[in-house]
Amino acid sequence: MTTRKPLGLPSLKLISIAAVAGIIAGAAAVYIKETGSGNGGGETASGQCTAAKDLAQKITPLAKGQVAAMVAANERRKLTTVAFNDADNKPVTLDSFAGKTVLLNLWATWCVPCREEMPALNALEKDMGSDKFQVVAVNIDTGDDEKPKAFLSETGVDSLKLYRDNTIGVFNSLKKEGLAFGLPVTLLLDDKGCLISAMNGPAAWDSEDAKALIKGAIGL
């Protein structure tokens, strides 16, 4: 774990928040009331996601330290129909990322833990983003794109693409699946869109613990 955040935010603060999340799952998350309706959720995947469930158990020992709050999937769950919009406001689903291991993160500008976590996610994408892995950070602010774009610019987040869902449908769909309780929420998915593990609350995603978890998921 570096002692200085690449984008100027103090590591100690993230460490403290992540530690709380590890002790009480989701305790550091900002809880939000469900509004609107969800979009595509989990699909029945009895055979398709067997490998993801096996992988989840295999890398469970790597969910420690700064990522101790990551909980392995206890059932086969395919999330390829979960939908949101890209930077051009065109609809995409998690199926669009087939072939890549994905770290899906939901965040909002009004969520303080999210704001503190974003530079770490940016650093992870900058360091490990490839044709095999991508951080997909989906902003769920209601309204237009002005606030999230301004926040990313002001904080120097330059490696994460802006994905959006101003209906909060993506959050609601994950909430109905029992995966999201507040913000931030982060899911690790395999290259077929099957759930490996999930976390409610922030983490130091630029830490060595986080990188080791991602490498384990990718198979490096």
Regions found by a protein language model. Give the residues of each.
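N-terminal targeting signals for export/organelle localization
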Residues: M1-K78, L220
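Structural microenvironment flanking redox-active thiols in thiol-disulfide oxidoreductases
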Residues: R115-G156, N166-L174, A212
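Extracytoplasmic
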Residues: R77-L79, F97-G99, S130, G143, ...
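Alpha/beta-hydrolase fold active-site loops
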Residues: T101-V102, F133, P184
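Conserved hydrophobic packing residues within short motifs/helices of P-loop NTPase cores
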Residues: L104, V136-V138, L187
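Conserved redox-active cysteine motifs that mediate thiol-disulfide chemistry
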Residues: A98, L106-A123
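A short beta-strand-turn-helix
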Residues: V71-R76, T81-V102
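Thiol/disulfide oxidoreductase modules built on the thioredoxin-like
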Residues: A150, E154-S159, D165-A217
